């Protein structure tokens, strides 16, 4: 009389026949088809077919950035492959820092706002407090991120300098009032703006630029001759690509002359640059 051997729950099961190996085929359209057989959770043999398409994404970066990526790693990272290692480096989003001048909040305003918020909560009969800036469980006046998020429900104030001798320069709560908005000024908004001419004596007009030129590249090219005040690259509104010309303003005219003499006729991005001083407007 033959007796069957009882199986333990930890013993490997023998299915009798092995699974076929993974098969890979190249398709005419450039994709790959991968066929795999495996056992699912219910113990049944299933066939899995995958179609893989390889996509190459080309990113245009500055030459200096590409050279930095070729640097050899040192220290504890010495000998490892180039690029970002996900085990030691976390890549986050770029945080845009917004600096705003002329906005101040007095202690009296903070106390008034906190008292008003407490009164609203008490009137509703609830102890839930929510910040209007970051939506946290605290008063808006006590928000720790208030300096980062900025003022809530308040328009930005003019950042013009305040003169202590000017009568009417400070309004209620010590806030600055523009000259044309003061009582009895009799001036229209922006009348002095159009009468003031801009000094373009240190501004260069750069032409014959490629359509893929970026403002950072122009700034890196011209900053070696002196301090740059402003860089304007003309772009198409629909495509966002450069129109082929730009304006570079220096703080000093001597720096602009030096840049014009060195870069006029200079080969850059497979094109010959043309640099000349900007002509004043009529």
From Swiss-Prot:
Keyword set, alphabetical order: Cytoplasm, Initiation factor, Phosphoprotein, Protein biosynthesis, RNA-binding
For this protein, the record's InterPro entries field holds: eIF3_g, eIF3g_N, eIF3G_RRM, Nucleotide-bd_a/b_plait_sf, RBD_domain_sf, RRM_dom
Coiled-coil annotated residue ranges, if any: none
The RRM domain is annotated at 202-280
Q: Name one GO molecular function term.
A: translation initiation factor activity
Which family does this protein fall into? Belongs to the eIF-3 subunit G family.
Q: What is this protein called?
A: Eukaryotic translation initiation factor 3 subunit G
Q: Which organism is it from?
A: Schizosaccharomyces pombe (strain 972 / ATCC 24843)
Upper classification of the organism: Eukaryota, Fungi, Dikarya, Ascomycota, Taphrinomycotina
Gene assigned in the entry: tif35
């Amino acid at each position: 009389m033959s007796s069957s051997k009882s199986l333990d729950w930890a013993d490997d099961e023998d299915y009798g026949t092995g699974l076929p190996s993974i098969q890979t085929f190249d398709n005419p359209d450039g994709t790959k088809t991968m066929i795999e057989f495996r056992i699912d959770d219910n113990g049944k043999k299933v066939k899995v077919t995958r179609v893989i398409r390889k996509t190459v994404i080309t990113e245009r970066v500055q030459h200096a950035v590409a050279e930095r990526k070729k640097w050899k790693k040192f220290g504890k990272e010495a000998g490892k492959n180039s690029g970002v290692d996900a085990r030691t480096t976390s890549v986050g989003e770029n945080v845009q820092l917004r600096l705003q001048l002329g906005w101040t909040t007095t202690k009296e305003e903070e106390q008034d706002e906190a008292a008003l918020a407490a009164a609203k909560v008490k009137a509703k009969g609830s102890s839930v407090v929510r910040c209007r800036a970051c939506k946290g469980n605290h008063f808006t006046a006590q928000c720790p991120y208030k300096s980062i998020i900025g003022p809530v429900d308040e328009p930005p104030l003019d950042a013009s300098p305040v003169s202590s001798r000017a009568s009417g320069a400070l309004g209620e709560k010590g806030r600055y009032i523009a000259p044309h908005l003061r009582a009895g000024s009799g001036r229209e908004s922006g009348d002095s703006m159009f009468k003031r001419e801009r000094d373009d004596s240190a501004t260069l007009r750069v032409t014959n630029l490629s359509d893929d030129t970026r403002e950072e590249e122009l700034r890196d090219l011209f900053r070696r001759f002196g301090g740059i005040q402003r860089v304007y690259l003309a772009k198409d509104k629909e495509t966002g690509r450069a129109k082929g010309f730009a304006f570079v303003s220096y703080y000093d005219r001597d720096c602009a002359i030096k840049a014009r003499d060195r870069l006029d006729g200079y080969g850059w991005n497979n094109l010959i640059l043309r640099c000349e001083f900007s002509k004043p407007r009529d």
